[in-house]
Amino acid sequence: MAAVKKEGGALSEAMSLEGDEWELSKENVQPLRQGRIMSTLQGALAQESACNNTLQQQKRAFEYEIRFYTGNDPLDVWDRYISWTEQNYPQGGKESNMSTLLERAVEALQGEKRYYSDPRFLNLWLKLGRLCNEPLDMYSYLHNQGIGVSLAQFYISWAEEYEARENFRKADAIFQEGIQQKAEPLERLQSQHRQFQARVSRQTLLALEKEEEEEVFESSVPQRSTLAELKSKGKKTARAPIIRVGGALKAPSQNRGLQNPFPQQMQNNSRITVFDENADEASTAELSKPTVQPWIAPPMPRAKENELQAGPWNTGRSLEHRPRGNTASLIAVPAVLPSFTPYVEETARQPVMTPCKIEPSINHILSTRKPGKEEGDPLQRVQSHQQASEEKKEKMMYCKEKIYAGVGEFSFEEIRAEVFRKKLKEQREAELLTSAEKRAEMQKQIEEMEKKLKEIQTTQQERTGDQQEETMPTKETTKLQIASESQKIPGMTLSSSVCQVNCCARETSLAENIWQEQPHSKGPSVPFSIFDEFLLSEKKNKSPPADPPRVLAQRRPLAVLKTSESITSNEDVSPDVCDEFTGIEPLSEDAIITGFRNVTICPNPEDTCDFARAARFVSTPFHEIMSLKDLPSDPERLLPEEDLDVKTSEDQQTACGTIYSQTLSIKKLSPIIEDSREATHSSGFSGSSASVASTSSIKCLQIPEKLELTNETSENPTQSPWCSQYRRQLLKSLPELSASAELCIEDRPMPKLEIEKEIELGNEDYCIKREYLICEDYKLFWVAPRNSAELTVIKVSSQPVPWDFYINLKLKERLNEDFDHFCSCYQYQDGCIVWHQYINCFTLQDLLQHSEYITHEITVLIIYNLLTIVEMLHKAEIVHGDLSPRCLILRNRIHDPYDCNKNNQALKIVDFSYSVDLRVQLDVFTLSGFRTVQILEGQKILANCSSPYQVDLFGIADLAHLLLFKEHLQVFWDGSFWKLSQNISELKDGELWNKFFVRILNANDEATVSVLGELAAEMNGVFDTTFQSHLNKALWKVGKLTSPGALLFQ
């Protein structure tokens, strides 16, 4: 109990202290209409240094936010700042700096037309008007500028100002103007107008009653006659008679002193009067005797000082209220100051000050005003600032408004830091944009190179097939016999004519080899396998062949000998395509030193062109020597790479007279073709002349006419999922596709399609009404059955690949009953036709051409349906890739506007040309093949797209942006989220669209099925009764456009 009492005593003591503090400071607190927060008021009145530091920090935070604000609503910062100042500076004055804050706010937001109808901006002006010398001028200025003319508060405050000046006629005119302008809220304005009329009527009645009372009072009091004759009285001294009435009459109590009337003796010219004490007492008693008179009105209570009405001091004041006494008592006696200073001891106790101490560091109430500062009207300063800003021609070279604006000044370093951060941010964004553009350009180049590579590979495969069908002789080769008269002389060199023939043959073969290898060099690089020496252990243990002279010491073969027939079939290629080094001067020193160009038979490693050509022949770091029996036994012989000195026939052995014997060994050389004779194993002459003689003792050579590069190590590049050949191979491996009842395969060419002609699909004839869409690989036609006006859609493809039918079949298989789209496919030799059953022909592209029918309700319905459709596609692991308006058909919900249970049946997809089945197509591919990515090319958000599923999310966002703003998607990065460049707040139900775009653009690595389901559920919550009624009206108008007759005549 004692503890409870102690706590209660402490609490009451604290409350008493707060009450004392409030009682000492309440007369300095300015009242607010909306009231004050008590906790903030107590902290503001505490007058502590810690509280003051907190206020200064908060004020500096507001100033910093105002200077470097980058959002879309700067008025919000000013509104919060001024509201905070009103609450934390209850005493007002110079310390709050309210007038300067309001001037800065209205000057900063003066050019923002969007705030002219904002109640917050009008509130700033009204607060500034209370500080102006002439508030009416401020209201006239606002009315001329069009600020707040659509708000009721503007007219209410304006009329109150006129009412305070008792100009009721003008105030009523202001109310009437506001009602005529239909200011919002109109009900509040009308209510204030009625209250104003009631107040004016009450004041008028009171004034009439007061005038009647004054007239009755004046009639009962004697009146002074106008222009009365004033006759003088007396013989010697003429005196004018005095006629006084009303309050000018002399009171009886005033007969004393100097104003007493003269006695009778003085009137009878008696000069000496003897004082009679008794007579004076009797007269005094008679005069002082009170007389009973009735009260005309009850006395006014004069103890209450706050109930008196202010008025003039010199009228209407009766003599009874004047101070009594002689005139001597009315003379002010000046105070006489002593000529000395009284002594005060130092130990004397000083008088106690009040508990509310004013800290001089916080309150500057008694500080002197700066002499150079002039006090002007805030409205005039705002107007002059506006005029100066319009006429301003000079440009400050530093951020003057950021340094000197507000209470606290910012240093140049802080301003430079902010400018540097801003430039750095812009520079990073520019770098990201540049890198994205370079990446897109490189990707485009890679795609073009892959396309060229596919064409070249297709051509090579066709040529290889043709060559394998032809029968070629096994030993049909062209031999070049070199006849020389100096056969007996071993040191004789080759003639120049023979060298020229051999050189021409070699250059022709090399040109063809490089032409065949060049397309492969442009494709994606395939890493070569590292050579493993342990894999050759079995080959090392093999015994050497029985016929050593027939062993060829050579590396791994890199060229294939072709027959003359195959050579002649390839000679129609233009020579400028064959070799990229044609016409290039090789960098050789022979022409400089000897004066002529050295022509060699073998590749010269010192020749730059030969070196570049040979670099393409290199595969692995090391090559082993293969024997003849290890070579393939096909009619095409393998040519050694560099050892041309080896004898290859018995005639050569007889001509040269020497048979070289060598052992089977493994030779390891570098990948660069070295200029050495390690593989020749010539006779061991040590002299240079001997080596020259040995190498030049070639009598006859076997030189092929053409060389063809082998493709043993080449691998197939990554197939594109949109390639028709790849899709054809994929569909051939699916037996369930051909077994489907909806697929009809006909072994004949596709019939020719013409407008107003009939085509047979199944067992029915259809008439082609219109060619709706023409694309690169397919067309869309509107057809109708014979003797019927019901239109439907067929898709005609130029490739015999029923990809759309395959996607529909997989959706039906994986989604079961959730997918209700029916279509049939007719496959021909040179194309296929997909017939979509039970759908309309009116696409979303047609609806966009009639933008006046696209209301908010229609947009919500279309996006909701699109979210549900794409959610089903992603559940089936299928990415559409082209959610454009041309492939979206309006269906049942549009034609049956009053069936509210079919809100998810408003759209249907009829084109799956860019779709990818991720369950089957497992190869890695680039996202640039999707049409959605091609449409949004250049957007930075595509650089963060890591999953194919996100492409459909961007497609939905782009379609919603197209419906709302009639243009494709434009986004920007604000530091944390991707947002639209357009202003969403101006749209109807802008909060819903803001959440939609932020969520769908920032899905990142989340599962797209959950994101789509969440957005669809949020969209579905909008379909209430009011929304459905508006939607039905809009659908009824759209239904007129979707009729078959209206479609055909568009």
From Swiss-Prot:
Role played: Essential component of the mitotic checkpoint. Required for normal mitosis progression. The mitotic checkpoint delays anaphase until all chromosomes are properly attached to the mitotic spindle. One of its checkpoint functions is to inhibit the activity of the anaphase-promoting complex/cyclosome (APC/C) by blocking the binding of CDC20 to APC/C, independently of its kinase activity. The other is to monitor kinetochore activities that depend on the kinetochore motor CENPE. Required for kinetochore localization of CENPE.
Expression tissues: Highly expressed in thymus followed by spleen. Preferentially expressed in tissues with a high mitotic index.
Induction: Induced during mitosis.
Enzyme class, spelled out: transferase
Entries under SMART domains matching the protein: Mad3_BUB1_I
Modified residue annotations for N6-acetyllysine: 250
Domain BUB1 N-terminal: 62-226
Protein name, per record: Mitotic checkpoint serine/threonine-protein kinase BUB1 beta
Post-translational modification: Proteolytically cleaved by caspase-3 in a cell cycle specific manner. The cleavage might be involved in the durability of the cell cycle delay. Caspase-3 cleavage is associated with abrogation of the mitotic checkpoint. The major site of cleavage is at Asp-610.
Residues with site note (Cleavage): 579-580, 610-611
InterPro entries on file: Bub1/Mad3 (IPR015661), Kinase-like_dom_sf (IPR011009), Mad3/Bub1_I (IPR013212)
Motif D-box boundaries: 224-232
Database matches in Gene3D superfamilies: 1.25.40.430, Transferase(Phosphotransferase) domain 1
Gene name of the encoded protein: BUB1B
Region Disordered: start-end pairs: 368-393, 456-480
Span list, region Necessary for interaction with KNL1: 152-185
